């Protein structure tokens, strides 16, 4: 999985467990693609401080996933529902396809 996608998924699932400041910095640097220097200047800290905070956030998010496996479960369910959708399309089972579409959209 692409690193950005992995980080975004981890943040989607576990971001609320970070402090407000960590969330702000992580969103700015990782999701909004702001430079470390820009974020450091906005917060009045040094660039290294922002870098260290991002590293700590990545570690915390990875640790949550190692313990809870929510992203892994989500990806497995999504894969299974996609397979159901493929099978339903082959057998023209419109109702199954409709249900699987709803589930995929919710995921």
Identify the residue ranges that each predicted region occupies.
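Short, Lys/Arg-enriched N-terminal segment that forms or immediately precedes the first helix
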Residues: 2-14
